[in-house]
Amino acid sequence: MFPVAPKPQDSSQASDRLMTEKQQEEAEWESINVLLMMHGLKPLSLVKRTDLKDLIIFDKQSSQRMRQNLKLLVEETSRQQNMIQELIETNQQLRNELQLEQSRAANQEQRANDLEQIMESVKSKIGELEDESLNRACQQQNKIKDLQKEQKTLQVKCQHYKKKRTEQQETIASLQMEVCRLRKEEEDRIVTQNRVFAYLCKRVPHTVLDRQLLCLIDYYESKIRKIHTQRQYKEDESQSEEENDYRNLDASPTYKGLLMSLQNQLKESKSKIDALLSEKLNLQKDLETRPTQHELRLYKQQVKKLEKALKKNIKLQELISHKKAEDTEKKDEPSKYNQQQALIDQRYFQVLCSINSIIHNPRAPVIIYKQSKGGAQNFNKDLVQDCGFEHLVPVIEMWADQLTSLKDLYKSLKTLSAELVPWHNLKKQDENEGIKVEDLLFIVDTMLEEVENKEKDSNMPNFQTLQAIVSHFQKLFDVPSLNGVYPRMNEVYTRLGEMNNAVRNLQELLELDSSSSLCVLVSTVGKLCRLINEDVNEQVMQVLGPEDLQSIIYKLEEHEEFFPAFQAFTNDLLEILEIDDLDAIVPAVKKLKVLSY
């Protein structure tokens, strides 16, 4: 663009003024070009041309207006740029503030969630404490009730013990009276014993045989007293029954009543006859157990023999004492030998007398006694003369045979018990120890108990069934020997207990009833696992989006390829811009852009 040049005038002043105006106008256009260049626009050039076809000519006013308009536009654009820059900065600040507020809101939300969790935990703890306090209160109430019950039971026991003490005191008093009565009876018994013995033997008892005879007298006296009491009791009963019968007969007004009473009397008389017959049988048995006349004769003969032996013993003692008194200093060797022999003979005689008394004791077995009777009868004539003890030899031999046969009996019983009751471990008999009858009785009693138990419990399995059960257990649980059965059973029981504890814990955690079956427990655990897997899948879908697995794999591969380069680029930017935060990269770049302008 070229401004319209004023027409040339003749005067020099006009030319100078025009030149100055031209220079001033060019300077203004230069200043405008500077402004345009500062704003990134191309400058305007003032061209001096003579050809006016391609030119547009403005006058001074229009050029001045143009300059003003350009200045205004440039100023307006600069102002708008400043405003835009301020808006960008304010927008960035607002974004930063929004991020801060969002982070604060997230923190507040997280804090609120934490507080809610804390509040829920506090509520649960409060509920637990309330439950514990209620349980403690219930336990205390139950304890109070139990203590009250115990107090009542103790009071009842105290009353019972008081009653028992009074009863014991009464029993003590009655026992004291009974003791007094028994003491009197014992004194009477001793008096009667001595009286009967003095009547029979015409002397005072002072030997062992005398004491045995006193015991025998006491036994028969007690039997006689018992029979007297029973007889008196039966006579009293018969008298009372006869009186009742007479009363019944007197009370029966009619013939029918008389017949009924007679029938009743016949029944009662039959029962009495039966009772009397049973008593008769008992008395006959008692009489059979009593010694016979022959036995009494034997006892008398033994008493006579013992008296003779006692007299001989007394004479020997007198002779020995007399010889000791006479020959205290003068003792020859033959006299010493005779005295020792006499003492040995005396001891032998005492031993044989004791053996004879044992053999003829009523407590001796019947077979032994019967076998020894013949020998005693054969030696009666000699006993009167020289008091021989030849009849003791066969008896002692028979006893030895019986004792030796006990070993065979023990062996046979042992084999029988091994067949019948093999689970009873009988202790081994020592060869040095003798076989006792108590051991044989113990074996027989054990076998009888087993037989009785088998008869009572017929449903009990036999030995073969039990053996089959044990072998099946060994095969089932892989136990090679019987010694490993009990440890394996303990292991099975411990595993079973652990499984029961685990099932009980799962039932408590899943809030199931204790009576629920294992199928219900397994189904609930399966449902819970299914729900957990579904929640995990939903969380993965929320993170990765609703895409298929192949696209997720591609995204992960792209991320693995892109992330190292992006991380290196951001590290370089942080080093160049000398900042530490990623959020400060964009504001720093904008500042550099503004500074470059």
From Swiss-Prot:
Superkingdom classification of source: Eukaryota
GO cellular component, one term: centrosome
Assembly description: Directly interacts with tubulin-gamma; this interaction determines centrosomal localization.
Protein name: Centrosomal protein of 70 kDa
Function: Plays a role in the organization of both preexisting and nascent microtubules in interphase cells. During mitosis, required for the organization and orientation of the mitotic spindle.
GTP-binding as UniProt keyword: no
Organism (species): Pongo abelii
TPR repeat placement: 483-516
